[in-house]
Curated annotation (Swiss-Prot):
Primary location recorded for the protein, binned into one broad class: cytoplasm
Protein name: Probable transaldolase
Subcellular locations according to the entry: Cytoplasm
Catalysed reactions, semicolon-separated: D-sedoheptulose 7-phosphate + D-glyceraldehyde 3-phosphate = D-erythrose 4-phosphate + beta-D-fructose 6-phosphate
Pathway in which the depicted protein is active: Carbohydrate degradation; pentose phosphate pathway; D-glyceraldehyde 3-phosphate and beta-D-fructose 6-phosphate from D-ribose 5-phosphate and D-xylulose 5-phosphate (non-oxidative stage): step 2/3
Length: 217
């Protein structure tokens, strides 16, 4: 499973990249707003930190303007992945971009039917929002399971990029189902390393080591 950081905060991305766990980055208009940075500038900086896909989202709603925005965004760096909404115009844009060799992330997916359309349109990634799905009384992981089954049935190459990840249980469940990628805030990714018994074990080892009076260095 690939790990993408869902953030536009440069320091957080650098910290995660230093661990070797970062495979890519996803951004959206809300994250750009939160960063307080210029969209083009921050996207370019992120692309310089990771060689993996960096999702940058168009904000137009019609195909023609989406294409113009996509042209500007994909000129930033070779690893820019154009993010489009799961609408008919978004799918049309996805098809045009993918036919041209550009990575596309089709976002705001809330049904297996939508995911099927994204794959048919040649999407590199489809982003089902599990947390938001759960918030509205649905089962986000059932959605991931359905998409996995459909994609396996027809050998679609589109990768399932689990988004709106709220906690480490989402990550575990997505991995067990076989999702290709998950994107989450860096704090969620870092939290995967935490376990109370690991901390307790370290404390015990250090206490016993101190009692030996030795030093490795």
């Amino acid at each position: 499973m690939q790990f993408f950081a869902d953030t536009a905060e440069i320091d957080d991305i650098k910290e995660l990249a230093a661990t070797g766990l970062l495979d890519g980055v996803t951004t959206n208009p809300s994250l750009i707003h939160k960063s307080g940075r210029d969209f083009i500038e921050v996207t370019k900086e992120i692309c310089g930190i990771t060689d993996g896909p960096v999702s940058a989202e168009v904000v137009a709603l019609d195909h023609a303007t989406m294409m113009k925005e996509a042209d500007k965004l994909r000129a930033i760096a070779d690893n820019v992945c154009i993010k489009v909404p799961l609408t008919i115009d978004g799918l049309k844009t996805c098809k045009a971009l993918s036919d041209d060799g550009t990575m596309v992330n089709v976002t705001l997916c809330f049904s297996a039917n939508q995911a099927l359309l994204a794959a048919k349109a040649g999407a590199t990634f489809v982003s089902p929002f599990v947390g938001r799905h759960d918030d509205n009384g649905f089962n986000g992981m059932e959605l991931i399971r359905d998409i996995r089954t459909i994609y396996d049935n027809y050998a679609f190459e589109t990768e399932i990029l689990v988004a709106s990840v709220r906690h480490t249980t989402h990550v575990l469940e997505a991995a067990l189902i076989g999702a290709d990628v998950m994107t989450a805030p860096p704090k969620v990714i870092m939290a995967l390393a935490n376990h109370v018994l690991t901390n307790k074990g370290i404390e015990g080892f250090l206490k016993d080591w101190e009692a030996t009076g030795q030093s490795i260095l």
